[in-house]
Amino acid sequence: KNTVVEAGGYDPGTIGEDMELVVKLHVYCRENSIPYRIRYATDAVCWTQAPEKLGDLCKQRRRWHIGLFQSMMRHRRIFLNPKYGLVGLISYLYFLVYELLSPYIEVFGILTIVLAFAVDLINVPFMILFFGIYVVYSAILSLTAFFARIYTVDLKLSFSDVLKAIGLCVVEVSCLRLVLAWVRATALIGYRRRKHAWGRIER
């Protein structure tokens, strides 16, 4: 708690308060030569309001992307700066490429495929096969994370629950992910007006 207060606490100018605080702690400890270790508490219990509608999910992901952008811009001095260790050399680069810029890469890729299809420059059977492999592989990754979490908290699932999880993972990869990629790609439109907007989620 003392370190959080000394580092400046939560920044009221951001809406991604959790990530911003963690990065701020890294920067503060590095700049002040304070030995530290930030770990993930697997047994921590916290409650959050999960969106139940697609519109609310889009608001949440838009807020997350804006919060990510704000945090990375505030701490851009650590980018590839060896003074900040692996956080600046690897973690920042990861979040820049695979989180902040990835929706733009995804949307560009989709538009490229549509254009190639329109001008008959695409091998349709190969594209379908490739997309199928992508869906199966991504669904397996999601299911692995899901079942690992189920195992660690010792929850019991029925066979129907397992089938639902498999179906939802396939839908998430093949449909929902594309929708959320568009939401994230357009999140910064009107940024000045919405940079402090939390976005209300219906209970």
Feature annotation, model-predicted:
Residues 1-85, 93, 97, 202:
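Non-transmembrane catalytic domains and loops of membrane-associated enzymes and transporters
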Residues 3, 121-122, 195-196:
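Residue-level recognition of short, well-ordered coil/turn positions
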Residues 12, 42, 136-139, 193, ...:
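Intrinsically disordered, low-complexity regions enriched in small/polar residues
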Residues 56, 60-74, 165-203:
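Membrane-proximal soluble regions of multi-pass membrane proteins
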Residues 84-87, 120:
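Membrane-helix boundary/interface segments in integral membrane proteins
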Residues 94-192:
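Membrane-embedded multi-pass helical conduit in multi-pass membrane proteins
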